[in-house]
Amino acid sequence: MNNEKKLENKTGESKEICLEAVRQDGLSLAFVENQTEEICLEAVKRDPYELIYVKEQTPEICIEAVKQEGMTLEYVKEQTPEICIEAVRQDPYALAFVKEQTFELCLEAVRENGMTLEYVKEQTDLICLEAVKQSGFALQYVKNQTEEICLEAVKQNPYALKYVKKTDRRNLLRSC
């Protein structure tokens, strides 16, 4: 009886009832008054987007969510480098929600999917080069096109020629 009392929260919900509810349907987390880390982890395992309803996010809960669905990074209140790297590994497009991008994180994203160059805040020639090597069409997002970057893009996909700036197109065609 004493142990049972300890498990009850303000609204009279027992921990076991709450756990069972979120195991059945993660959406029920929105109605759990006294959320524990265990209950929140269960909900996020069931549906990573339940992170939206977690009142007190911990790094463990956030990592669990982004490992399953990188785009849930959008709902992480306090991003850490570890959370961001897990999110980008799961889905390179999660880079769009990274508040403090690092060179390494951007490089990892574009190597996995060159089109994520669109979300790189500070482009470098190396990041752009890696992006177009993965997808020639990433050239459309390159802010500072160099001959080397354009050539790599066209090597990867001849149709990337469409995105070479007109002033550079003639020079590029001469070198082919």
Give the role of each language-model region:
Residues 1-176:
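Alpha-helical scaffold segments
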